[in-house]
Regions:
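Structural motif corresponding to the early beta-alpha repeats
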Residues: 72-102
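Short, acidic/polar
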Residues: 27-39, 104-118, 166-171
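Active-site mouth loops of central-metabolism enzymes
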Residues: 19-30, 93-109, 135-137
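Active-site groove signature of glycoside hydrolases
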Residues: 116-135
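N-terminal binding-site loop/beta-alpha segment at the start of enzyme catalytic domains
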Residues: 1-77, 81-83
Length: 334
């Protein structure tokens, strides 16, 4: 297992972390708790959750999973998505709840106390603003950061992070306080952060915690062109907004993976592990989140962090990705 500090916080965390969105479903809590513990047994320390994942249920599951192992884990949760009253800016409805964005100090403090209770811990290692504030209730970044800094002083939070912000907002957050991390989508198939966010974070010692690095299973090698998703699976219509899910593009991915067979054998790894290792080797991409449902997936995620790719391995994979092209811009190779 490899570990890297969360920016300037001096909090070491495994380069592979567990994304626990699915733990919010309420299905098979016991299996999920076992999966988390298997990953911890294999060296994973970073666990990412949020109050909005199952409206608190994910945090409860994580809290149960880490009982007796608090010193083994780095708990990252979030604030900002608010559904308890009319404070904040409306952003939509989900599961019958009116969801709002609120980064005002009073709602942040309520969220922190609720998260501490659900997780059954005394301190949140990394508290992240889930999304940037929006109109009409546009809480100034400086006001939000002052609240988060106060929570650090009170010992309720160890480090401050943000997620899903623009490069301009990222700079304002960093200038306004001690910023440890930024969470963003980044993968082999979504490399826009390489143009701004990742270089900025690398320059200013801010950790980049990357999610969707396996692109909802597309980068595991297990989603072929003939795969049909169940009606209840959102991926059934994913190609409308994620062109890589088109049948012809899934085949292009499988063809690329087939060319990596010698790498898989040399590193004794799966396609998913190789993909994660390449992602973690990119400049600025310090930590990679992996979703999981089963114990085997937890073990597989942990194993990815043990893979050390050579510079030639990284360059070879990068060249293959360049040749693959980008269906978003309709620039596809071969």
């Amino acid at each position: 297992m490899q570990y890297r500090d969360l920016g300037g916080s001096e909090i070491p965390a495994s380069i592979v972390g567990l994304g626990t969105y699915l733990a919010g479903s309420g299905n098979n809590d016991g299996e999920y708790i076992t999966a988390i513990n298997k990953a911890l047994d294999h060296g994973v320390t970073l666990i990412d959750t949020a109050p909005s994942y199952g409206w608190g249920h994910s945090e409860k599951v994580v809290g149960q999973a880490i009982k007796g192992r608090r010193d083994d884990v780095v708990i990252a949760t979030k604030c900002g998505l608010w559904w308890h009253d009319e404070r904040g800016s409306p952003i939509g409805e989900k599961d019958g709840k009116d969801v709002r964005l609120s980064l005002r100090p009073d709602t942040i403090r309520i969220e922190v106390e609720d998260s501490l209770r659900r997780l059954d811990i005394e301190t949140i290692d990394l508290l992240q603003c889930h999304k940037p504030a929006v109109e009409p209730e546009l809480t100034p970044i400086e006001e939000t950061m002052a609240c988060l800094a106060a929570l650090k002083e009170e010992g309720k939070v160890r480090a401050i992070g943000i997620s899903n912000v623009s490069i301009e907002q990222l700079d304002r957050y960093r200038v306004a306080g001690e910023l440890a991390s930024h969470q963003c989508r980044y993968s082999m198939l979504f490399r826009a952060p390489e143009n701004d966010v990742l270089p900025y974070c690398a320059e200013h010692n801010v950790a980049s915690i990357c999610y969707m690095s396996l692109e909802q299973g597309l980068l595991t090698g297990k989603v072929g062109p003939d795969r049909i998703f169940n009606a209840g699976d959102w991926r059934a219509n994913a190609e409308q907004w994620l062109p890589w899910f088109r049948r012809e593009n899934r085949q292009k991915l499988l063809d690329m993976f087939a060319g990596w067979q010698d790498l898989l054998e040399h590193h004794d790894c799966t396609i998913a592990q190789l993909v994660i290792a390449w992602t973690a080797a990119q400049p600025g991409a310090t930590h990679i989140l992996c979703g999981l449902r089963t114990a085997d997936q937890g073990i597989e995620a942990a194993g990815a962090a043990a893979i050390l790719l050579s510079e030639s391995d990284v360059q070879r994979i990068s060249s293959d990705l360049t040749a693959l092209g980008n269906p978003v811009t309709e620039q596809l190779g071969g």
